[in-house]
């Protein structure tokens, strides 16, 4: 996915160029802990500082009780719709960030029942 016009999320290529691993990876589908694949080329990444500053972590935690910012958390389509609706209510940069991620999430849900957030 091309991320050149993205304000909040980075492609894996952009994340790698930053020389940082302090990112939350949004991984398409169900993550396979046995394969231990991190920083997938189809993933989008958001820096931990930005995730916190936007309140995206709190938004997700409010909808997905098992959300773990340091581990793996699966998000299904119903949860994603609730995240989008709540972000729209809250507005501002949080809504912008969720809106930026939406095309990627919608593409994911055409082929997968979940996407996985891999925490820092």
What is each stretch, according to the model?
Residues 1-114, 120:
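Acidic (Asp/Glu-rich) sequence patches and key acidic residues
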């Amino acid at each position: 996915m091309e991320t050149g016009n993205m304000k909040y999320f980075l492609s894996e290529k952009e994340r790698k160029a930053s020389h940082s691993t302090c990112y939350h990876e949004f991984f398409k589908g169900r993550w396979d802990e046995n394969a231990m694949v991190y920083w997938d080329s189809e993933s989008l990444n958001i820096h931990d500082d930005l995730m916190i500053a936007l309140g995206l972590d709190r938004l997700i935690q409010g909808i997905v009780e098992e959300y773990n910012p340091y581990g793996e958390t699966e998000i299904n389509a119903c949860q994603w719709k609730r995240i989008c609706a709540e972000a729209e209510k809250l507005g501002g940069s949080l809504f912008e960030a969720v809106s930026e991620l939406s095309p990627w999430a919608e593409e994911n849900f055409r082929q997968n029942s979940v996407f996985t957030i891999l925490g820092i």
